[in-house]
């Protein structure tokens, strides 16, 4: 059991992302986790209602901001004013846009967070960097020329309990294996390939939980393939634990995926995982041990992996067992939060010791 660490730190988060998305969801989850440790926090973000409500419920100070590029300099002045008023120990910028808006003349260290292989041009005003995978940390070190400033900060897969849902809520039967996709509806995520797989797996049903620019295209594709009666597009959902609870398999068929927190969430929830050898999964998923991996865009291999799990309970149990071990080693909520707090403290100490 991880020892719970508390801290008197004061952190300002700048979050300029969309209202939905895996990285944006993790930002909110981490702010909640830090709040539970008693850390004082200020958040500057877009005023998405579910985000604003989460901060208000916890008494976290929130400043709304639009982060429009054409209004950048007035908003930078506002950010500077907020930081001077709140006097945080460290400013944590989540992803590209937030990092590009942070002013250059702050008296606090600035951390830029990478959920992917981002261009460092947006991180010019950051003193330190954090990547969610080992390879992203390598990328940061090489691109910045400052590998000692690049920290590893995994996301966590721990999910709070949600009100239960039933398959019938989505028009899906109880007597067929259910494959769950938690993903944006975007070409990068390989949703089209999963629909093609569904056409070859007539005894399985599919729950697609996500939103995005290609949603209507995928709905049309499901109709064209004749699988619409076995596929439910549920839109973006915040009750990930409840959805995983009704799933037999969790799938991540991405073409591009720097990590994919759903990997760790499936391990936490005890749901067998099928993924592609995208950058994140191939670093952390061991084929045949804690997940099944297929090559990117390899339809036959994806179909085979899904089909194997549908008929081989022993295989599923083995993946669940070892997935739980990987989760506990690297992606457990309390340990990930503790490591972040320790990293914050290290950055603050290094900054004020004169290391710039």
Regions found by a protein language model. Name each.
Residues 21-32, 177-200, 213-219, 300:
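A conserved mid-protein helix/loop that constitutes part of the nucleotide-sugar donor-binding site
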Residues 44, 272-275, 285:
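Short hydrophobic beta-strand element within catalytic cores of glycosyltransferases
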Residues 71-75, 92-99, 114:
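Short His-centered aromatic/hydrophobic patch
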Residues 287-288, 292-300, 308-313:
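Conserved acidic donor-binding segment of nucleotide-sugar-dependent glycosyltransferases
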Residues 301, 308, 315-330, 336-342:
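A short, well-ordered alpha-helix in the C-terminal region of glycosyltransferases
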């Amino acid at each position: 059991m991880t020892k719970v660490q508390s801290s008197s730190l004061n952190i300002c988060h700048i979050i300029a992302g969309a209202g939905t998305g895996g990285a944006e969801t993790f930002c909110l989850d981490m702010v909640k986790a830090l709040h539970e440790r008693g850390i004082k926090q200020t958040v500057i973000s877009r005023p998405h209602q579910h985000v604003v409500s989460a901060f208000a419920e916890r008494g976290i100070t929130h400043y709304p901001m639009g982060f429009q590029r054409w209004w950048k300099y007035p908003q930078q002045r506002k950010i500077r004013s907020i930081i001077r008023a709140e006097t945080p120990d460290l400013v944590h910028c989540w992803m590209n846009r937030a990092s590009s808006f942070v002013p250059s003349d702050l008296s606090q260290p600035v951390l830029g967070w990478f959920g992917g292989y981002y261009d460092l041009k947006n991180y010019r005003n950051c003193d330190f960097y954090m990547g969610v995978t080992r390879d992203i940390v390598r990328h940061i070190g090489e691109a910045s020329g400052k590998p000692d400033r690049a920290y590893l900060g995994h996301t966590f897969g721990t999910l709070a309990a949600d009100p239960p849902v039933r398959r019938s809520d989505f028009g899906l039967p109880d007597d067929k294996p259910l494959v769950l996709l938690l993903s944006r509806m975007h070409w990068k995520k390989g949703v089209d390939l999963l629909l093609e797989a569904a056409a070859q797996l007539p005894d399985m049903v599919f729950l697609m939980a996500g939103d995005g620019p290609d949603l209507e295209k995928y709905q049309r594709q499901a109709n064209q393939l004749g699988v619409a009666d076995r596929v439910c597009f549920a839109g973006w959902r915040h009750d990930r634990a409840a959805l995983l609870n009704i799933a037999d398999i969790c799938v991540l068929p991405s073409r591009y995926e720097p990590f994919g927190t759903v990997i760790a969430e499936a391990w936490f929830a005890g749901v067998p995982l099928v993924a592609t050898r995208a950058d994140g999964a191939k670093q952390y998923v061991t084929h045949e041990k804690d997940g099944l991996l297929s090559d990117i865009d390899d339809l036959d291999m994806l179909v085979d992996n899904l089909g194997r799990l549908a008929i081989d309970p022993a295989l599923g149990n083995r993946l669940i067992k070892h997935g739980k071990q990987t989760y506990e080693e690297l992606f457990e909520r309390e340990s990930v939060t503790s490591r972040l707090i320790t990293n914050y403290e290290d950055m603050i100490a290094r900054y004020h010791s004169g290391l710039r």
